[in-house]
From Swiss-Prot:
GO terms for cellular component: cytosol. HAMAP family: TrmD. NCBIfam families: PRK00026.1, trmD. It catalyses: guanosine(37) in tRNA + S-adenosyl-L-methionine = N(1)-methylguanosine(37) in tRNA + S-adenosyl-L-homocysteine + H(+). It holds the Pfam family tRNA_m1G_MT. This is tRNA (guanine-N(1)-)-methyltransferase. GO terms for molecular function: tRNA (guanine(37)-N1)-methyltransferase activity. It is an enzyme of class 2 (transferase). SUPFAM superfamilies: alpha/beta knot (SSF75217). It comes from Helicobacter hepaticus (strain ATCC 51449 / 3B1). It comes from the Bacteria. Belongs to the RNA methyltransferase TrmD family. Specifically methylates guanosine-37 in various tRNAs. Its EC number is 2.1.1.228.
């Protein structure tokens, strides 16, 4: 899959792919990445890309003509604008988008984009939460990372995708490790975890995942309850 980033700061993007899992995915040809500098599409020698909003007020807005010129070169790409007004990105979006051939992330700065750019070029507008950051690069990288994990071969062990948080609207069950420094005291771990009965471990993990979700994310727990009720209803219809 190809990932393109339209940005005013290409080095912010490029540096992310110099380590860890996505570096290996890049080296193995599982993904390709390009960071396109919006300034390269500017019309003057000063590479000016922004203007004050015509309605007045503080801040600058990325110009439609400059960014539009860049977007016109990406005719066969699935274009995602990063914006606080976008749909909150979810785990199922990562899986869905992992089947695309080419995704372009449009990273805003200042007060955002000329609205006509979104109307004319956006396939989707995404947000990573109800908060503001200084630019769209970090949110774009978050989406890219989440999507890339679902591409076959990117994770060393495909089983790592099983039982993750947000699968079936639940958080992942708690994980524990062996303790080698006995001088530091911790509470005991669930005894079933270390007995090797995978059926019982699986059942316990499901119960703990439900408890964890109910405690940390009551909103997600309500969605889980609706999901279960819908499943039960569907099963009755099938019978």
């Amino acid at each position: 899959m190809q990932f393109s980033f339209l940005t005013l700061f290409p080095t912010l993007i490029e540096s992310y792919f110099t380590d860890s899992i996505l570096k290996r995915a890049l080296q193995n040809g599982l993904i390709s990445v390009e960071a396109l500098n919006i300034r390269d599409y500017a019309l003057d020698k000063y590479q000016k890309v922004d203007e004050p909003p015509i309605s007045g007020g503080a801040g600058q807005v990325i110009r439609a003509d400059v960014l539009g010129a860049a977007l016109q070169t990406l005719t066969h790409s699935h274009i995602i604008f990063l914006s606080p007004c976008g749909k909150p990105f979810q785990q199922y979006d990562a899986l869905r988008l992992s089947h695309k051939k080419h995704i372009t992330f449009v990273c805003g700065r200042y007060e955002g984009f000329d609205e006509r750019l979104v109307e004319q070029y956006a396939n989707e507008v995404m947000s990573v939460g109800n908060f503001i950051v200084t630019g769209g690069e970090l949110p774009a990288l978050m989406l890219c990372d989440s999507i890339a994990r679902h591409i076959q071969g990117v994770l060393g062990n495909a089983d790592s995708l099983q039982g993750e948080s947000f699968e079936d609207y639940l958080l992942e069950a708690p994980n524990f490790t062996k303790i080698f420094n006995q001088k530091i005291k911790f509470s005991a771990t669930p005894s079933e975890y270390s007995k090797g009965n995978h059926s019982k471990i699986s059942g316990l993990k499901k119960r703990l995942a439900i408890c964890k979700t109910k405690y940390f994310r009551p909103d997600l727990y309500q969605a889980y309850r609706v999901f279960i009720e819908q499943q039960q209803l569907n099963n009755k219809v099938v019978k």
